[in-house]
């Protein structure tokens, strides 16, 4: 953990090596209950974004509170597709080594750009991702953020529906109930998801985020038990009931040099996304100096790196090239330990689904600029049913979670992590040429290239 934290602190603090701290106004980011006026940057106000810890203010959340909540925001069911990302380029155990390095590198870049958003919000005196974009880049392009928010949330709902479809059919099978994947999906959607998504107040669902991180940690423990216990190796207790026999070959660490490793990169772009919440975490942090904010980021993304590295390694080392897009599908339905993981994941995804769906629905309304006074219950209900039906139909047709994760990451994941934060930061620099502005240009360019190539590779096998 200490090594991961130090790596991320270096990534975050490299921004402090290029120039001196520029003081900014006290309480540039206010408590979430206080609206800060959105003002266009004047020509003399746009400059270097504050890097230091001169400011104090913010909310009441301590660093440990923020770290725990940010870890919950980052780590989700998407980690269950990462072993398939390794299998996309390698089939030998040594492929895990470059995969772990890639996980760490993507974590560091994601942490850095998460911090950039906080810095831009502080400089532009804004409290949200979209407001920061409007002030730094311009309102004329605000539809880009609205569309990206909608698509990002919708891809999340699509992935969750696919996870529930696979998880429920396996859970039903484990208790002797025969049902198809589509039947399971329609059942859980109509009986559980639709009523939850129609709820007007989602506050009661907040505790499910805790279930999510506990479920992921339990799943990691269960995967470790099965790998080190050899239950799915040759002659293993549960091998006969596995989705497919483990498959290993000779494509190891060197295979990471192939373009197919970008599929894992794109999945990781999606896996680390919590960037829309960066302004909220900065605003709610007690004594919210940038140095304290960086500590929150370093510990949180460091923990996410360790969890992702462990679960990716355990899944791939157990099943190799046979790793499914949802790694839980590989395990036998007769394996009680993994059935408990499926239950934990199903509860977590079910509780989180309407929270994410609210972002999808609001994103559509924002994209089409529907006035608040027109957002009545009738429109709310019709839109909910329509969007949920479309999502369910797509989830019924699509069966490869890894494909959805890689395409979503290649398109909007790379944009949200690599491109948008760096563009906002560069706009506040007004043409300055420093090490950091050059670094941001490189990161943005990498996002474009990786997104284009990653999308092509992910789709070519369809």
Which residues are covered by each model-predicted region?
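N-terminal chloroplast transit peptides
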Residues: 1-29
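Membrane-interface "cap" regions at the ends of multi-pass membrane proteins
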Residues: 29-85, 89, 110-111, 115
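Membrane-interfacial loop- and helix-cap regions that link adjacent transmembrane helices
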Residues: 43-59, 64, 115, 120-146, ...
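Residue-level signal for short hydrophobic patches within transmembrane helices
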Residues: 63-71, 75, 97, 101, ...
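The first (N-terminal) embedded transmembrane alpha-helix
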Residues: 63-81, 190, 269-274, 311, ...
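Central hydrophobic cores of alpha-helical transmembrane segments in multi-pass inner-membrane proteins
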Residues: 77, 107-116, 189-198, 420-421
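Short, hydrophobic transmembrane alpha-helix segments
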Residues: 82-97, 202-203, 403, 460
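Extracellular loop-to-transmembrane helix junctions
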Residues: 85-126, 164
């Amino acid at each position: 953990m200490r090594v991961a934290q130090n790596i991320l602190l270096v990534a975050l603090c490299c921004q402090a090596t290029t120039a001196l701290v520029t003081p900014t106004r006290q309480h540039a980011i206010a408590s979430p209950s206080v609206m800060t006026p959105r003002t266009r940057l004047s020509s003399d106000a746009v400059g270097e974004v504050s890097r230091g810890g001169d400011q104090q203010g913010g909310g009441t959340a301590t660093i440990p509170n923020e770290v725990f909540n940010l870890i919950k925001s980052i780590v989700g069911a998407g980690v269950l597709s990462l072993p398939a990302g390794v299998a996309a380029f390698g089939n030998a155990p040594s492929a895990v080594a470059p995969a772990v390095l890639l996980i760490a590198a993507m974590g560091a870049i994601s942490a850095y750009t998460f911090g950039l958003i906080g810095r831009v919000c502080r400089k532009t005196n804004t409290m949200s991702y979209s407001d920061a974009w409007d002030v730094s880049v311009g309102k004329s392009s605000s539809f880009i953020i609205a569309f990206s928010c909608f698509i990002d949330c919708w891809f999340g709902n699509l992935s969750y529906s696919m996870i529930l479809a696979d998880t429920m059919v396996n859970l039903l099978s484990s208790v002797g109930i025969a049902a198809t994947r589509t039947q399971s999906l329609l059942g859980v959607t109509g009986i559980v998801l639709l009523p939850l998504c129609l709820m007007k107040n989602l506050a009661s669902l907040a505790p499910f985020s805790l279930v999510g991180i506990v479920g992921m940690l339990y799943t990691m423990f269960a995967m470790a038990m099965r790998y080190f216990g050899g239950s799915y190796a040759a002659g293993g207790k549960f091998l006969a009931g596995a989705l497919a026999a483990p498959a290993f070959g000779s494509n190891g660490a060197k295979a990471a040099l192939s373009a197919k490793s970008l599929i894992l990169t794109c999945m990781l772009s999606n896996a680390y996304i919590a960037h829309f919440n960066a302004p909220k975490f900065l605003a709610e942090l007690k004594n919210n100096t940038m140095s304290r904010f960086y500590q929150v980021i370093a510990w949180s993304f460091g923990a996410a790196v360790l969890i992702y590295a462990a679960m990716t390694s355990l899944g791939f080392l157990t099943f190799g090239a046979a790793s499914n897009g949802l790694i839980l599908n590989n395990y036998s339905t007769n394996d009680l330990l993994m059935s408990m993981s499926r239950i934990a994941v199903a509860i977590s995804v079910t509780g989180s689904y309407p929270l994410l769906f609210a972002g999808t629905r609001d994103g559509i309304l924002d994209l089409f600029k529907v006035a608040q006074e027109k957002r009545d219950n009738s429109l709310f209900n019709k839109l909910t049913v329509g969007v949920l039906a479309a999502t369910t139909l797509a989830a019924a047709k699509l069966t490869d979670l890894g494909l959805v994760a890689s395409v979503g990451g290649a398109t909007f994941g790379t944009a949200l992590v690599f491109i948008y934060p760096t563009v906002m930061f560069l706009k506040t620099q007004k043409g300055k040429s420093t090490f950091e502005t050059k670094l941001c240009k490189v990161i943005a360019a990498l996002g474009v290239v990786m997104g284009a190539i990653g999308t092509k590779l992910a789709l070519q096998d369809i």
